[in-house]
């Protein structure tokens, strides 16, 4: 039920007014909610940054951008040209994969995260580049920082500690110390 999901976002926003929330949404979910309803929800709740994934084409993305929201795009570590083009045509931050999967190909021209960030900048992308996927340890945050990334997404490492709040707080401190 998307209504409960949307109500939960508003409740979190009210509980944590100083925390900037990003909305991650799959294009088919936006279609299920209704594009206009989704846009109105984001605008009325000051949720300006949308990470839109699973795009079939640019129609919905362009409609969201035209409404005044910022749409971010994901770029895999091996820097597929079509993903870079999508990022160039968008207006939000770029979500760059920080580390390759074990079986994932690596772009020989840009084998490191630093190379990837520099390449995206050379392509004319001047918006923030947030790096995630593979950021599991505090040292990974330093890797992102040293590569020129503007921020790091840390997910499962923190979420796995949800039942041990003191350990979660300590882990967050460890990550912050590397920023």
Q: Whereabouts are the PLM-identified features?
A:
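Glycine-rich phosphate-binding active-site loops on the catalytic face of alpha/beta enzymes
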Residues: 45-59, 95-105, 145-168
């Amino acid at each position: 039920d998307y209504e409960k999901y949307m109500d939960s976002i508003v409740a979190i926003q009210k509980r944590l007014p100083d925390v900037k929330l990003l909305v991650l949404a799959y294009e088919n979910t936006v279609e299920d909610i209704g594009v206009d309803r989704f846009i109105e929800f984001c605008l009325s709740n000051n949720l300006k940054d949308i990470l839109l994934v699973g795009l079939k084409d640019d129609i919905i993305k362009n409609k969201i951008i035209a409404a005044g929201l910022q749409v971010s795009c994901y770029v895999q570590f091996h820097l597929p040209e079509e993903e870079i083009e999508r990022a160039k045509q968008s207006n939000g931050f770029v979500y760059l994969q920080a580390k390759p999967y074990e079986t994932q190909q690596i772009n020989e021209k840009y084998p490191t995260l630093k190379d990837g960030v520099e390449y995206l900048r050379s392509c004319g992308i001047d918006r923030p580049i947030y790096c995630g996927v593979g950021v599991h340890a505090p040292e990974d945050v330093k890797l992102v920082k040293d590569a020129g990334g503007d921020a790091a997404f840390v997910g499962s490492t923190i979420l796995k500690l949800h039942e041990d709040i003191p350990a979660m707080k300590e882990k967050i401190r460890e990550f912050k110390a590397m920023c």
